[in-house]
A protein has these predicted regions:
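Positively charged n-region of N-terminal signal peptides that target proteins for export
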Residues: 1-4
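C-terminal motif of bacterial Sec signal peptides marking the signal peptidase cleavage site
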Residues: 13-15
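Cationic-aromatic interfacial patches
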Residues: 17-101, 108
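Extracellular-facing segments of soluble proteins and assemblies that are Gly/Ser/Thr-biased and enriched
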Residues: 99, 103-195
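Short, well-ordered loop/turn sites that connect or cap secondary structure elements
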Residues: 196-203
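Short coil-to-beta-strand transition motifs
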Residues: 209-217
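Short beta-strand-centered aromatic/proline hotspots
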Residues: 216-225
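Low-complexity, Gly/Ser/Thr/Pro-rich intrinsically disordered linker/tail segments
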Residues: 231-284
Length: 284
């Protein structure tokens, strides 16, 4: 797509592109973390064993939470690849890799991965009217309109729809719609679309997100509790360049990795970004 306007380039160049000191600290640490892994498990729910005394959060069928818990993973010891087939420079921070394509363009980065997972779930549920995202200029892009054969036209900072002859309801067409979202949406726009959630109300599918230049987003993909009502959770991300969506290790508390402790959480230090407890948000 050569017709990428300067406004979007400036915003998206910095959407997920600058590592903070936390990533400089952990990037090349050779971590020897004994992960609680069931090598025969092929989903997020079955791959990672529970910590002692904890019970996995039960999710209802046909919900986003259940969809993420049962998301298939690539085989144990798989490596994180970039969109161009190259290996990610740092292979020491992931505990597992989601079995979903990254595409062959440098598009599916941080916020894009969370939007992809959300949209894929809604697509499988045939909830097409619920699939919509805003571009960074505020223009709302509804997948339901795309399915009817409408396409997007970008001129300067203006976006408009135009009608083609045919409806396009295939999965391939859906992925083409998502590429437009990846190009013109990001942490800045997604952050404005989501609603803030306190840590005490965290659910699977919630997102830690910082919108801006730079910005980043990681998604909660599993949770568990014990009898003392202590909660732990698991996180997944993509990064830049566009790369496989992967489960993050907990480098700050290797004894519970890849789980993270929600109790008294004020600062969340993930391997490549630092978040605040105020950064937790939920899809509407």
């Amino acid at each position: 797509m050569k017709k990428i306007i300067l406004f979007f380039i400036i915003i998206n160049l910095f959407a997920c592109k600058k590592e903070r000191k936390i990533s400089e600290t952990f990037s090349f640490i050779k971590t020897e973390i004994k992960l609680p892994i069931n090598k025969n498990g092929n989903t997020i729910k079955t791959r990672f064993n529970l910590l002692d005394g904890f019970t996995r959060i039960t999710t209802k069928p046909n919900t986003f939470q259940n969809y993420l818990q049962h998301f298939k993973l690539k085989p144990v010891d798989s490596k994180v690849h970039l969109y161009n087939g190259a290996l990610k420079y740092n292979q020491s921070i992931h505990a597992g890799i989601l079995a979903i394509s990254v595409g062959n363009r440098d598009l599916q980065q941080c916020a894009d991965a969370t939007m992809r997972l959300r949209a894929e779930f809604l697509f499988t549920q045939k909830r097409y009217n619920d699939i919509h995202f805003n571009f960074t200029n505020g223009f709302r892009v509804d997948y339901s309109k795309w399915r009817k054969g409408f396409r997007l036209k970008v001129k300067g900072n203006k976006v408009s729809w135009y009608k083609t002859d045919k409806e396009s309801t295939s999965y391939k067409s859906f992925t083409q719609y998502m590429q437009w979202i990846f190009m013109y949406a990001g942490t800045l726009s997604l952050n404005k679309e989501m609603k803030s959630i306190p840590i005490s109300k965290m659910q699977i599918g919630d997102v830690f997100i910082q919108g801006g230049s730079p910005g980043h987003a990681i998604i909660v993909v599993n949770m568990a509790k014990n009898t003392q009502n202590k909660t732990v959770f698991m996180l997944a991300q993509s990064y830049m360049p566009a790369q496989d969506i992967h489960i993050l290790k907990n480098l700050n508390n290797t004894s519970i990795s890849p789980w993270y402790n929600a109790k008294n959480l004020t600062v969340l230090q993930s391997p490549e970004w630092e978040f605040s407890n105020k950064d937790l948000k939920r899809f509407n």
